A protein has these predicted regions:
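A short helix->beta-strand "capping" segment at the edge of beta-propeller domains
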Residues: 1-12, 41-43, 185-189, 198, ...
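Flexible "stalk/tail and boundary" regions
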Residues: 23, 38-41, 46, 62, ...
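Short, solvent-exposed loop/turn segments at conserved positions within beta-propeller repeat blades
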Residues: 31-32, 71-72, 117-128, 166-168, ...
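Beta-propeller fold detector
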Residues: 46-50, 86-90, 140-144, 182-192, ...
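Short loop/turn segments immediately following beta-strands, especially the blade-tip
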Residues: 174-181, 291-296
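Blade-level signature of beta-propeller repeat domains, shared across WD40, Kelch, NHL, RCC1
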Residues: 256-299
Length: 299
């Protein structure tokens, strides 16, 4: 495990998620303060907007307007040039669970994952889907049968979508067709057998690596937040562990590469992902460290 220094970028939050490097600044959301935030060059943290029904994945349209997932009402919101938040897409018809992470392609098409079941309510596991949201806000399901689709990235050439399956012991990849639909699912990395178990606890216990958020680098490797092992892991195709960064005693739930040279790895960390505990405390942070290979792809 790499012995790297971790630097605190932002602190005093409930549950930080969705870090993105955009326009030379770090953006992230905080679940239970319902905030989208940006870290300014002087280190100050600015609240950009409030998402009443809990923010998650972030992205930007080609014209610069920001998209943000509104989890609990299963919508994608758009921030207009005057700062107003408006509905971009209602994907509730496609979702059994909360809407979650998102990646936006260069042409403005957005891919949004959903839980598949009521995780926080203690429901049994059911597979989830990936929803394609067009730039005009229309939407359709483009992939199913995924075990809690979570962090997603698009390759630098725009031809491959990578999807972390949190409870699936794997990272999946799909060829992106010219119209934005997806080809058949393939393994990018597999960490063991796919659990066939309704209990979330047993599924999580069976995961060698539990991939939450992800970010791509210029060598074609993927950094993932391994949310059960308090570490970020750099993986090659097939699942070979190339590098790792410990965040113990905190768990890490999302990662992003950025900084002036693309070699800063940002890590969203918190003691756990328990909604009751996290919403009642301000123990979440964003940390950073330096890695060797710079960012590539989207986000």
């Amino acid at each position: 495990m790499s012995d790297r220094q971790l630097t605190e970028i932002a602190a005093g939050f409930t549950y930080t998620e969705g870090p993105r490097w955009h326009e030379d600044r770090l953006w992230f959301v905080d679940f239970y303060t319902h905030s989208v935030n940006v870290v300014n060059p002087d280190g100050s943290v600015e609240r950009v907007c409030t998402v009443e029904h809990q923010p998650s994945g972030l992205g930007w349209l080609p014209d610069g307007r920001m998209l943000v997932v509104s989890m609990k009402d299963r919508k994608v919101l758009r921030r207009e040039s005057d700062g107003a938040l408006v509905e971009h897409a209602d994907i509730s018809a496609h979702c059994r669970g909360y809407a979650n992470d998102m990646v936006v392609a260069a042409n403005g098409q957005a891919y949004v994952g959903e839980f598949g079941f009521d995780l926080m309510g203690g429901a049994d596991h059911e597979n989830g889907v990936v929803v394609l949201v067009e730039a005009d806000g229309t939407s359709r399901v483009v992939a199913g049968g995924l075990s809690f689709p979570n962090g997603m990235c698009i390759s630098p050439d725009g031809k491959t979508l990578y999807v972390n399956e949190l409870f699936g012991n794997r990272i999946s990849q799909f060829e992106i067709e010219p119209d934005g639909t997806l080809g058949p699912r393939e393994d990018f990395a597999s960490f063991g057998d796919l659990a066939d178990e309704p209990s979330v606890e047993k599924r999580l216990a069976a995961c060698t690596i539990a991939p939450d958020g992800q970010t791509l680098d210029a060598d074609g490797a993927v950094w993932i937040a391994d949310c059960v092992n308090q570490r970020a892991v750099r993986l090659g195709e097939g699942g070979t562990v190339l590098d790792e960064v410990s965040t113990a005693p905190l768990g890490v739930f999302a990662v992003a590469l950025g900084g002036h040279d693309g070699r800063t790895l940002f890590l969203s960390v918190a003691p756990d992902f328990d909604e009751t505990k996290r919403s009642a405390a301000r123990e979440a942070k964003v940390l950073s460290t330096t890695v060797d290979v710079p960012h590539a792809g989207r986000p």
